[in-house]
Amino acid sequence: MMKNQLAGLMKQAQAMQDNMKKMQDQLASIEVEGQSGAGLVKVVMSCKNDVKRVSIDPSLLADDKDMLEDLVAAAFNDAVRKAEATSQEKMSGVTAGMPLPPGFKMPF
């Protein structure tokens, strides 16, 4: 009986690993947008944290350089938070039913 349980567990682990790989591939194609300055600065990135585009409203180009740098950083951080939230949401379906400790983060 123990051998059958172990074989079942190994099969389940392999299926979960395959599902996680598929989900990670999908996350690379999902894009999120971070914004700051009421949408004057936008950063679009994949859920794998690859920045795709940065948009800066022309009205900001004549303004203070330090303020513009702060807005770009804030938009980037907003995009990172959205990418992390989307990744966790998508991966939660893959890890559902696994006895993971509270707060355990999968490596993705």
Swiss-Prot record:
Superkingdom to which the source organism belongs: Bacteria
Q: What does this protein do?
A: Binds to DNA and alters its conformation. May be involved in regulation of gene expression, nucleoid organization and DNA protection.
Q: In its UniProt entry, what is this protein called?
A: Nucleoid-associated protein mma_2329
Q: Which organism is it from?
A: Janthinobacterium sp. (strain Marseille) (Minibacterium massiliensis)
**HAMAP family the record matches:** DNA_YbaB_EbfC
- State the oligomer form and interacting partners: Homodimer.
Q: What is the lineage of its organism?
A: Bacteria, Pseudomonadati, Pseudomonadota, Betaproteobacteria, Burkholderiales
List locations, semicolon-separated: Cytoplasm, Nucleoid
Coiled-coil boundaries: none
